[in-house]
């Protein structure tokens, strides 16, 4: 299969004769010369893909880093610090039109940070809060804590 590419352009500097501009009448306008160039491309025998592409060598350290970041499970409210530790924070309420951020801490593993997020979400939002590890059964300790906070009595610590 052949393809033809036509390129047309006007060369304003080209002239049809070798005479100088001084000999032409002053009222004549310079139009230039229109040129057309055709390029024929033959696609009958396309090159093999494997032979035309470059082989790029990626260092093993970059491949390992890319694979570990791709395989990491992302948790809600959890992010990894550049030095490897995991940070957890939760956003709730509104301060100046933006969600208020509550810092939950820095943890050694993503799972620990996700668990801290889940506990904070259940305490702040309630048992229907979106969590990382599913919907846990409502623990009696959480209910006792909410009841004691509402009544103003001594609060129990929930672990």
UniProtKB/Swiss-Prot annotation:
Write the record's keywords in alphabetical order, separated by commas: Activator, DNA-binding, Ethylene signaling pathway, Nucleus, Transcription, Transcription regulation
- The domain of life for this entry's organism is Eukaryota
Which stretches hold the DNA-binding feature? Answer: 74-134
Classification via Pfam families? AP2
- Cellular component annotations (GO), alphabetically ordered: nucleus
The family database entries (Gene3D superfamilies) matched by this protein are listed as: AP2/ERF domain
Region (Disordered) location? 1-36, 128-159
What are the BP-aspect GO terms?
ethylene-activated signaling pathway
| Regions of compositional bias (Basic and acidic residues) in chain numbering | 136-148
* Subcellular localization, as worded in the UniProt entry: Nucleus
By what name is this protein known? Ethylene-responsive transcription factor ERF069
* Species in which this protein is naturally found: Arabidopsis thaliana
Q: The organism's lineage?
A: Eukaryota, Viridiplantae, Streptophyta, Embryophyta, Tracheophyta
Point out the gene that encodes the protein: ERF069
